[in-house]
């Protein structure tokens, strides 16, 4: 894991090698939640253990689930009727998924639930989801209309509502709630963004035998359904794979970088990033359970970020090495992640000599020779890992990457993985002068 020693020192290097990709965060969190709401005992193999996973597990235990960890697996005895518990308190840590999903599920209970989280979670929008839940009859008390903390309870009333699609997690949260409601619920999604991630939630519901009708972006759930226990092995995380792949793609090595533990049948949105890179000319071989990256040049261009918006930071780094300028667009949602990713990655890459400029809904990037610099993660795991890739492929100089404990959110063993691929990434030691003057 990224240790309490929170900074990384990165030197230009020539990555290559073979490695297993860590488990998917999105699948792990959904598996934990669905297992906790199922009848019987579910077994989840190869689960990602991270602060977000712990936040979800803690909340699910408060809803009556019993959890045992055995190695890299979880045995979860679910509580299919968790909605008549004593008043509850959910601390969501820094998990946007836990915040949105459990907020909506709390409306199935007449028992008030206090929902809060870390100070950084307060910047994650929740108002559009709360507005739709209120229209269905939810009772909500909050100090401010736009963030945690707040108290929420149901019951909801049968009916139809429109939900904002600006963040796909709003629609996913409502779909999960409607799936388990004792009465019919339907909703329409307005201007759905990040569509692959919503489809991933529906794939889960379908695999668990939940019935619903879908007419484009309108869904109807009949009510009165329940979940049965299941066994599931979490596949690799395409979002994390993007960083490892970038180590290899930009390398000057003659050897490939091979990423294992990936499923070509998976519906994760960031899987589409690899198809995009192939279209731009990158030498990538996509197998059933692995991806092979060969160092190669590739073109930039006009890139619609909506299908893989979480990849904006690493794609910004890659586009610095493209043969021609790039415009990343349709990425407004990137402003409301763990950081304003548009501003954050542009600011930090500019320190490294990158010609990276924010636009209204994305970035304009010109090919640039990057150099080492002192940069900061903005407490965002994807910004941190993207900057690590940039530092490894800088043309000169070391990079001090400050405040990297956030990487634990999705890739606790990122430093070990980078080193396995022969990237010179290590925890900060005292040989870098004047650290306290730069890393706050």
Swiss-Prot record:
It catalyses: 3-phosphoshikimate + phosphoenolpyruvate = 5-O-(1-carboxyvinyl)-3-phosphoshikimate + phosphate. It comes from the Bacteria. Pfam families: EPSP_synthase. PROSITE patterns: EPSP_SYNTHASE_1, EPSP_SYNTHASE_2. InterPro entries: Enolpyruvate_Tfrase_dom, Enolpyruvate_Tfrase_sf, EPSP_synthase, EPSP_synthase_CS, RNA3'P_cycl/enolpyr_Trfase_a/b. Pathway: Metabolic intermediate biosynthesis; chorismate biosynthesis; chorismate from D-erythrose 4-phosphate and phosphoenolpyruvate: step 6/7. Phosphoenolpyruvate binds at residues 25, 96, 124, 169, 341, 382, 409. It is found in: Cytoplasm. 3-phosphoshikimate binds at residues 25-26, 30, 168-169, 310, 337. GO terms for biological process: amino acid biosynthetic process; aromatic amino acid family biosynthetic process; chorismate biosynthetic process. Keywords: Amino-acid biosynthesis, Aromatic amino acid biosynthesis, Cytoplasm, Transferase. The keyword Zinc does not apply. Coiled coil: none annotated. One of its GO terms (cellular component) is cytoplasm. The active site is at residue 310. Its EC number is 2.5.1.19. The keyword Signal does not apply. PANTHER family: AROM/DEHYDROQUINATE SYNTHASE (PTHR21090), PENTAFUNCTIONAL AROM POLYPEPTIDE (PTHR21090:SF5). Belongs to the EPSP synthase family. Monomer. HAMAP family: EPSP_synth. This is 3-phosphoshikimate 1-carboxyvinyltransferase. It comes from Chlamydia trachomatis serovar D (strain ATCC VR-885 / DSM 19411 / UW-3/Cx).
């Amino acid at each position: 894991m990224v240790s309490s020693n929170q900074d990384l020192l990165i030197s230009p290097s020539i990555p290559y090698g073979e490695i297993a990709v860590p488990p998917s965060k999105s699948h792990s969190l959904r598996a934990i939640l669905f297992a906790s709401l199922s009848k019987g005992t579910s077994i989840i193999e190869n689960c990602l253990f991270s602060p977000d996973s712990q936040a979800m597990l803690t909340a699910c235990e408060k809803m009556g689930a019993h959890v045992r960890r055995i190695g890299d697996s979880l045995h979860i005895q679910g509580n299919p009727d968790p909605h008549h518990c004593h008043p509850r308190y959910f601390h969501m840590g820094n998990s946007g998924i836990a915040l949105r999903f459990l907020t909506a599920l709390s409306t199935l209970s007449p028992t008030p639930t206090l929902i809060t989280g870390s100070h950084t979670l307060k910047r994650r929008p929740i108002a559009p989801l709360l507005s739709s839940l209120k229209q269905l009859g939810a009772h909500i008390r909050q100090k401010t209309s736009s963030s945690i903390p707040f108290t929420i309870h149901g019951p909801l009333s049968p009916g139809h509502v429109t939900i904002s699609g600006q963040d796909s997690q709003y629609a996913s949260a409502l779909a999960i709630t409607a799936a388990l409601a004792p009465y019919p619920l339907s909703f329409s999604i307005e201007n759905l963004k990040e569509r692959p991630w919503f489809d991933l939630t529906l794939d889960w519901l379908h695999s668990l035998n939940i019935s619903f009708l879908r007419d484009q972006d309108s869904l109807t759930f009949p009510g009165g359904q329940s979940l049965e226990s299941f066994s599931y092995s979490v596949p690799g995380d395409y979002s994390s794979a993007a960083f490892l792949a970038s180590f290899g793609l930009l390398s000057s090595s003659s050897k490939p970088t091979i990423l294992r533990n990936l499923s070509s049948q998976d519906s994760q949105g960031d899987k589409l990033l690899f198809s995009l890179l192939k279209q731009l000319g990158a030498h990538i071989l996509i197998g059933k359970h692995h991806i092979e990256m060969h160092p190669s040049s590739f073109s930039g261009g006009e890139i619609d970020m909506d299908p893989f918006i979480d990849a904006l930071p690493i794609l910004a780094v890659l586009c610095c090495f493209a043969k021609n300028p790039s415009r990343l667009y349709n990425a407004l949602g990137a402003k409301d992640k763990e950081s304003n990713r548009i501003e954050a990655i542009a600011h930090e890459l500019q320190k490294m000599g990158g010609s990276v400029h924010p636009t209204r809904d994305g970035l304009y990037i010109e090919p640039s020779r990057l150099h080492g610099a002192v940069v900061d993660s903005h407490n965002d795991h994807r910004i941190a890992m993207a900057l690590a890739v940039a530092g490894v492929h800088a043309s000169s100089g070391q990079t001090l990457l400050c405040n990297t404990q956030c990487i634990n959110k999705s890739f606790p063993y990122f430093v070990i993985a980078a080193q396995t691929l022969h990237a010179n990434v290590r925890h900060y030691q005292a040989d870098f002068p004047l650290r306290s003057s730069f890393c706050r």
